């Protein structure tokens, strides 16, 4: 109850016109937990049309604009988000360190990441307010998505296992291949649609192999990412939700 601010969410779900979630497995779990007669509708976390394109101009941060300009000949492995126990990324920094100098690892975060500053090819960048962070996203070579199930936090491990990150759509909008860890929410999006690689273990060896795999098959992964994004008809599901 504390997680729902005192609201009886089961009672609310039964009284609702439509119940909407953002991922297929979450729909199944919600129906089972709440004993709903109807499977909840699924509306993805795909951002609304935004006008950004590959290698967009950086307009909201002079420091970011300068960094991106300095990296114009580099291949950016990009992570954008919180860095914590649920999203450990040091193995990626180590992997990029071991690969050739055409690659750099960029971390855009508000988290303190002192442990990453020792890596020569890791670049830290502060947040840029949404949606303008997508200007930086548009310059990435590979996008990173990490969701590690943890216990003892206010959310269930299922929140990570059946993640539905908007990042999948932000990266795929630009045809950026992705690397994720091996959980259903990423395996059955990234790998199922052949738009990237899910590593079997979160270590330097597997991240390095994944980066090389994407580099060797870049056009295929990139094309599939664009198709995945274009095939998500969010507006149609919204229309369905509004029907009686």
Name these PLM-found stretches:
Residues 22, 79-81, 108-110, 125, ...:
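Short hydrophobic "strand-cap" motifs at the C-terminus of beta-strands
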Residues 44, 53, 58-59, 201-203, ...:
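A charged, aromatic-enriched C-terminal amphipathic alpha-helix characteristic of glycosyltransferases
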Residues 5-42, 47-55, 188, 192:
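A short, active-site helix/loop in glycosyltransferases that binds the activated sugar's phosphate group
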Residues 87, 129-138, 143-173, 180-188:
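Nucleotide-sugar-dependent
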């Amino acid at each position: 109850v504390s997680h729902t601010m005192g609201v009886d969410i089961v009672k609310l779900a039964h009284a609702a016109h439509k119940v909407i979630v953002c991922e297929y497995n979450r729909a199944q779990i919600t129906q089972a937990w709440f004993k709903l007669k109807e499977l909840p509708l699924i509306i993805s976390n795909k951002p609304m049309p935004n006008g950004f394109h590959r290698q967009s101009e950086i307009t909201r941060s002079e420091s970011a604009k300068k960094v991106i300009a300095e990296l114009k000949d580099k291949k950016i492995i990009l992570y954008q988000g919180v860095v914590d126990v649920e999203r450990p990324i040091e193995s990626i920094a180590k992997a990029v360190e071991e690969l050739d100098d055409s690659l750099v690892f960029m971390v855009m975060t508000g988290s303190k990441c002192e442990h990453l500053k020792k890596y020569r090819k890791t670049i830290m960048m502060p947040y840029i307010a949404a949606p303008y962070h997508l200007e930086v996203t548009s310059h990435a070579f590979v996008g990173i998505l990490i969701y590690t199930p943890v216990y003892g936090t206010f959310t269930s491990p299922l929140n990570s296992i059946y993640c539905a990150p908007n990042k999948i759509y932000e990266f795929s909008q630009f045809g950026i291949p992705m690397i994720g860890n091996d959980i259903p929410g990423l395996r059955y999006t990234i790998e199922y649609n052949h738009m990237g690689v899910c590593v079997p273990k979160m270590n330097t060896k597997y991240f390095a192999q994944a980066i090389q795999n994407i580099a060797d098959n870049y056009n295929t992964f990139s094309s599939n990412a664009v198709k995945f994004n274009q095939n998500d008809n969010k507006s149609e599901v919204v229309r369905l939700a509004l029907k009686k």
